[in-house]
């Protein structure tokens, strides 16, 4: 059982001894703060019940809880206060035992039902029922008794409002979370991270992303040293496609050393790319592929290659397309490598890579033959260029372009005395 609740129950049991002393009843209870509150009459158990309660208390103080309970179970009284007092004592004792919380709640509910307990005991028991109900996942009951406690005491209590918000969360009544969690946040002696998380979850679960982000922004301001808050805010910005704010947030987190997960590094790289900074997208991902934080696979290598290509860093792009192609069964990666080599005017390397794409079974044969024609032509190999232009003519997607190249190749070859 929850240690805090168990402590409360023990305190409540010990208070039974004090309640029997008439001196206690001269004290004004501070349990109720309502402006028009007038303390009710003070009651003490009748002599017969009081004796048995005393014996039960003695057994309890000697750690004989079962014996104490048997004494209390044996009490038979028609007096409403004595019955409520006894049921409260039984409920408190049961609450200290593992697995007896639900039975405890039943006795405590019977104790408060007639509203005959002394004021402080009445409100304390109402609160205990609520806490035990929350522990036992009886959320509707917990909410009922927390609300009753607030109504009876006129008090503002962080724990009560926080637990009410939690009960609403557990029952997926997300809209209901806001009122109590706002009060809990206002009452907290110091900022409570979980309270802000509950508030954020309320909005997020209802797809109210603007409000979700506002709460998360506030959370980052209050807990700037919590790295998880930064990345969560960044991901929320990505969710609403505010890529500039997302990048700014992830960059600040990165500079503070807060990015430690592969998904976070990948997100930063992706955001650089989305914000048209492909060279940074490539370099950050390359760095953490080398460190081992991000697993090296075809997808990551291709991402680095693509970013370098966008940045017109063709040498690096060709290298990473080649690495990716070796890990993959995708021949089109060799095609991409070949096109990058062509941009670098490395025609021989382009031809080798493009041939690997063909040998690997690429279904883009027409475009590959056309690219190989161009690479061979620029490399001065008109015979090979002519061979590939004829192959390119067989593909509908490249036939027209190939036909326009064919006479040009023939003319160049003729001018140089080369027979095709």
What annotation goes with each model-predicted range?
Residues 2-126, 134-140, 144, 170, ...:
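N-terminal leader/linker segments that initiate helical-solenoid repeat arrays
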Residues 37-44, 73-81, 112-118, 147-155, ...:
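Solenoid-like repeat scaffolds
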Residues 44-53, 81-87, 118-127, 153-162, ...:
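Generic helix N-cap/helix-start motif at coil->alpha-helix transitions
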Residues 59, 94, 133, 168, ...:
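Residue at a conserved register position within TPR or TPR-like alpha-solenoid repeats
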Residues 62, 97-98, 136, 171, ...:
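Structural motif corresponding to the intra-repeat A-B loop/turn of tetratricopeptide repeats
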Residues 65, 100-101, 139, 174, ...:
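TPR-repeat structural position
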Residues 298-312, 318-363:
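Alpha-helical adaptor scaffolds
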């Amino acid at each position: 059982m929850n240690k805090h609740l168990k402590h409360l129950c023990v305190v409540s049991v010990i208070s039974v001894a004090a309640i029997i002393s008439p001196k206690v009843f001269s004290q004004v209870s501070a349990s109720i703060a309502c402006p028009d509150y007038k303390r009710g009459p003070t009651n003490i158990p009748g002599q017969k019940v009081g004796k048995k309660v005393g014996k039960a208390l003695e057994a309890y103080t000697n750690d004989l809880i079962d014996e104490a309970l048997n004494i209390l179970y044996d009490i038979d009284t028609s007096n409403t206060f004595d019955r409520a007092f006894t049921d409260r004592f039984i409920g408190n004792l049961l609450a200290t035992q593992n697995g007896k919380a639900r039975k405890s709640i039943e006795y405590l509910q019977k104790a408060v039902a007639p509203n005959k307990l002394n004021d402080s005991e009445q409100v304390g028991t109402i609160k205990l029922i609520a806490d035990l109900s929350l522990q036992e996942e009886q959320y509707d009951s917990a909410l009922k008794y927390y609300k009753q406690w607030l109504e009876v005491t006129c008090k503002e209590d962080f724990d009560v409002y926080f637990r009410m918000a939690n009960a609403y969360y557990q029952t997926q009544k997300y809209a209901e979370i806001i009122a109590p969690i706002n009060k809990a946040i206002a009452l907290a002696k110091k900022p409570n991270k979980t309270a802000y998380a509950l508030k954020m979850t309320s909005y997020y679960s209802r797809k109210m992303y603007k409000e979700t982000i506002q709460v998360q922004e506030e959370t980052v301001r209050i807990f700037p040293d919590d790295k998880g808050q930064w990345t969560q805010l960044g991901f929320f910005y990505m969710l609403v496609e505010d890529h500039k704010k997302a990048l700014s947030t992830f960059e600040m987190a990165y500079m503070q050393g807060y990015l430690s997960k592969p998904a976070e590094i990948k997100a930063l790289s992706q955001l650089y790319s989305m914000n048209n900074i492909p060279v940074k997208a490539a370099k950050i991902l390359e760095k953490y592929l080398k460190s081992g934080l991000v697993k090296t696979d075809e997808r990551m290598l291709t991402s680095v290659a693509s970013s370098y290509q966008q940045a017109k860093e063709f040498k690096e792009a060709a290298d990473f397309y080649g690495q990716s192609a070796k890990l993959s069964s995708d021949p089109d990666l060799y095609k991409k490598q070949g096109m990058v080599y062509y941009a670098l005017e490395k025609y021989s390397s382009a031809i080798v890579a493009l041939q690997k794409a063909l040998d690997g079974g690429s279904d883009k044969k027409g475009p590959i033959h056309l690219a190989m024609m161009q690479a061979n032509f620029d490399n001065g190999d008109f015979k090979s260029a002519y061979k590939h232009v004829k192959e390119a003519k067989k593909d509908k997607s490249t036939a027209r372009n190939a036909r326009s190249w064919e006479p040009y190749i023939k003319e160049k070859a003729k001018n140089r005395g080369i027979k095709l």
